[in-house]
């Protein structure tokens, strides 16, 4: 995918990749694919064109660099990623760690959005009044300007955000859901999940308050 300042063009590109994304998805179970399609279309048709930002920018002081100069870093956090990983149970022992394949940047739209975030951060840094107090960019540096080079920088520096969620989605069972609208696990008796894993999509917000809301509502018998 190329670089897009026009969100409608990006949206059409994302929608055109739905079939190939489903073909390359980690599970080919028909129900899971239906759920993936529903979430994908929600992302592309509602979130992408909404006033809610697709990337969060965090500006913070990072101390002195090797030359003794003070540095400022900009962190970009993708809010509604299209890439989806998979969590595997490895044994029947609840104390054994599962196998996690996050598959970050496996969807080209995520690469495009992160690349645009790098360019936008640079634009902010070269615009007054911030530009009047900033020196030279140190990472990745001005020489990294071609899209392919920016993509390589992103791939080698990306990290996970502190919002683990979405592994036990609240969706209809025929769409691969794990819990119903009352937070009960399908196929089990009176077993509920009340944590961030039931959110089917990432929020452009911190997940902890949403967990408190779920837990509070359940404690009052609303679920």
What are the residue ranges of the model-derived segments?
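FAD-dependent oxidoreductase catalytic-site/capping-region signature
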Residues: 2-204, 209-210, 218-223
